[in-house]
């Protein structure tokens, strides 16, 4: 098997490290205090990059020891503690000496502590910008994606980032991120948002929607950074707030926004429950322009009068339908309508999600003014990029059947970081039990669910993404929005009750135009899902088992939450309809749509192709491994 991109990067890092040691034989490698005087390990411990050394403010790469200095990356280039010196001390241990890239004299400036992920760009990969997402977007898969826009005076799309005036610093970060050209949602959404228009965008995770709303927000704040905000109190006044349904998604958006806002002067802070609020309060007191938060924690901060919505210019809701489905509607309405938030039309409001059923659109329309509706075809959620398999498995046989699948992957050499397996279950107890059973049977696994502390969830996700535990057992807490690259196989151990939840689950694989595999265990307890599941598979030109077709013909397909709206788009603009009546097709029409006389319109959806060659190995459309990396998800 050819070496992966990560393997090549590791070998380059090793080579770079040896070269540096040879060129400076008289200077021993820095050893953190907690590792000193310990016996040598059997394998050498890879040194951390300079910017990751906790409490180490030593000289930037290639510089000399100098008093104070004016380094850009690590607190002015002098001292062992970049955050502990006296302001304006001039030199010595910890002094920033009036240096720093903004040339201020004295005082404390948050930007001086900003880690520079690009400092060693010429010699080694940047962890924050390259190793984080080891997938390269397959642009060929985006060429034929259906896109629909509706609304008044829709700005034309762009084809390159060079056509967009985002500001020099942000454009530099985009180039450093190695973003080649905009994804479809970015091509359309960014010009709309730069025009100051409200937007409702229907696009699933993996399509680049985080960058689609982060770029215009950061650019807008950069152009008006000197706005006067009230002073003299402990209340902070962010200019933008981004709401997300889960802690994990909030943390992910925060990390992306921090990456995009590097050296722009835009300060990004995250706030979510499950962690001590005091630490988040201290971060807020240091200044905030963009606040990424979950609805519950933001309400808490508003009630404590530690955050005010008075100066908000941008309001973004990511996974908006999920937040409403999870019961956050009262909290969201309180934030938007009852606090000191500027009214719609004064602020700019952005709603992004993978699905926008008509009921959700009614509620969301209360937050928007003269908005543009953007629908981007499903990329990586229910297309030919994902091979969907449904197998009839009794509850008592599920574990042994899962073991057969995992053994088949292992025998075909499909394992490790490039082929992660995500297993969805319905209950927290079931997640813990299955994780333990897999570990006992020789398959390293971890799990996340609502009863895990935030720290436990973050540790589990990190272990899964790195490939140390290539199997993650999860409840729906991980189904929406999480950025987990390399998921090659999604197993619905327990099928959800909602077909949209199924769509979101399998959307964890086949991301960024790459191939993926989704396996579902179906039995008599899932009969209500039979018909929408069969129709969903038909839409993507998947093979529907005969037994599932029989179940589908027997099951009743009423309204409820298993009625998917919008067909291949996951949602449509209800303003195009005379009413909220049912039985009409999506954008691609032909009289299709669920319950509307004749299956999916537009010639049967996405057209098949690819697949995994009939087994878990030997993929004929990309396969599990061997593909280089990207930061687009």
Swiss-Prot record:
SUPFAM superfamilies recorded: P-loop containing nucleoside triphosphate hydrolases
Q: Which cysteines are joined by disulfide bonds?
A: none
What are the Gly residues biased-composition ranges?
68-80, 87-101, 580-600
Q: Which family does it belong to?
A: Belongs to the DEAD box helicase family. DDX3/DED1 subfamily.
Stretches for region Disordered: 1-110, 555-600
Q: Which UniProt keywords apply?
A: Acetylation, ATP-binding, Helicase, Hydrolase, Nucleotide-binding, RNA-binding
Please report the name of this protein according to its UniProt entry.
DEAD-box ATP-dependent RNA helicase 37
The coiled-coil regions, if any, are none
Show the ranges annotated as biased composition (Polar residues): 11-25
Q: Where's the motif DEAD box?
A: 318-321
Q: What class of enzyme is it?
A: hydrolase
The terms under GO molecular function for this entry are: ATP binding; ATP hydrolysis activity; mRNA binding; RNA helicase activity
Ranges for the Helicase C-terminal domain?
401-552
Show the InterPro entries listed in the entry.
DEAD/DEAH_box_helicase_dom (IPR011545), Ded1/Dbp1_DEADc (IPR044763), Helicase_ATP-bd (IPR014001), Helicase_C-like (IPR001650), P-loop_NTPase (IPR027417), RNA_helicase_DEAD_Q_motif (IPR014014)
Recorded name of the encoding gene: RH37
| Annotated EC | 3.6.4.13
Q: Where is this motif: Q motif?
A: 159-187
- Annotated Helicase ATP-binding domain ranges read 190-374
Domain remark in the UniProt entry = The Q motif is unique to and characteristic of the DEAD box family of RNA helicases and controls ATP binding and hydrolysis.
